[in-house]
């Protein structure tokens, strides 16, 4: 497991403990002796939101009790995406947890008043398990790299089944995830989001490459556009696994939409190839993990939707990732990808 804190912002955890203790006391009227312990940032994961783990202790009805918790704070200066979907993230997690169709942590409290911690935040239950971290890459070192082929196979299948389960969630009642009037849902919504993203980073020298990428994709518009919920950052690294390599929880719902079923599958297979596929660019090849074709076949079997035209959605995934990389370049001051490499990635020169 990585020892590196990758949070976009950090704060004094003793001060946070004091503020949250008082805040929780007002929300737990039956509790006394409220105390927070073991506050810490996740290691090797959690780059988009400031996320802090802690254990909540209290006394209620004469009994000592405790609950593992996570506080997730809305991004401030370090904003990776142009759309503020923090409220939608919380509401979707609440809906998914209530339905039980996808393994999502329970949101216990949601605070919209920024005066408490400087920005809105929510507190959810802390699940116990292990995360395939990005830093260092899970395929190179750590528990996934050290697992047996059979264990990795179990992990891969469990992950794909949860990915597919998202596409069995009815969209009724999720209208709060809709986009603007001209692109309320479906591919139009997800497309509109990234057209606006490219415009958001228009002053970057990579912007002409991104625009060319959009033009290429538009000229090849896919026929297959199955409806479905978009998780967003759909990858093994945003799932937690237990000692049996089964999925405990699906995490990081920060960019949801009603944009269609194939975006998450495309993102998942693209990241899988990058992290642990035969041509892994960031991680290393891991035997035991299912191939792209096996992933697509299992996903179709579980969710019952067609993955036709997936190649287009994979190319769109590369455009999305390039947008994110350009924004991170602006935030960090270091070019995430050479421009020539971006042109090759987006197939525009």
Report each predicted region and the residues it spans.
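Catalytic-loop of the protein kinase fold
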Residues: 229-231, 236
